[in-house]
Every structure is written in C-alpha cells, then in structure tokens.
C-alpha cells in the first residue's frame, strides 16, 4: 500500500517547525531529509525515523518499513515541537 498524499501532507505539516526539511517520492513512499541527510521516511501511511539510541527515551515502537529493510521507529506524536526535537536530535547524530 502506497502512502496517501493526505498523510504525506499531514506529516509535512508536523515537520513545519524543522528547518531544512525536504522529501523525495520513491515507489509510492517518501524519503525524508534534513539538510540533505536522510533521517526517516513515510511508508504505508506511517511516519518512521531511523533507529537511534539517542531516541530511546521516547519508547517508539520498532517496525520494518518494507521487506529486508532495517528496523525503524514509528513516530506517533502530533506535537510539532516534539517532532522538531526528535528530528534535530537524530540529525546531530547522523551528520557526525
């Protein structure tokens, strides 16, 4: 099942507080970037971010976005300011 345009717009609205966000549509799903660094994606109407020890405090559910993929974390929050904190924390770790 591909991600709906409505869900994509919903997630992009959640990311409105984060600077440098972009996306690329691939095979019906979306890859998410911050300043050209991949931090997550939208798969089957699920907002997922890369697994990281720096995000353990949030206790996100681990999911597999598609067969043979690495485990990712399901972001089920609706607060754009918390989402901003999560993305910025992950970006700092990934851009080292």
Segments from the language model and where they lie:
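Charge-dense, helix-prone N-terminal extensions
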Residues: 1-96
């Amino acid at each position: 099942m591909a991600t709906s345009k409505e869900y994509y717009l919903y997630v992009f609205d959640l990311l409105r507080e984060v600077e440098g966000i972009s996306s690329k549509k691939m095979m019906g799903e979306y890859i998410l970037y911050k300043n050209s660094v991949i931090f997550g994606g939208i798969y089957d109407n699920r907002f997922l971010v890369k697994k990281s020890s720096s995000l353990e405090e949030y206790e996100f559910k681990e999911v597999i976005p598609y067969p043979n993929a690495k485990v990712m974390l399901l972001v089920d929050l609706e607060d754009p300011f918390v989402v901003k904190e999560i993305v910025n924390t992950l970006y700092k770790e990934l851009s080292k």
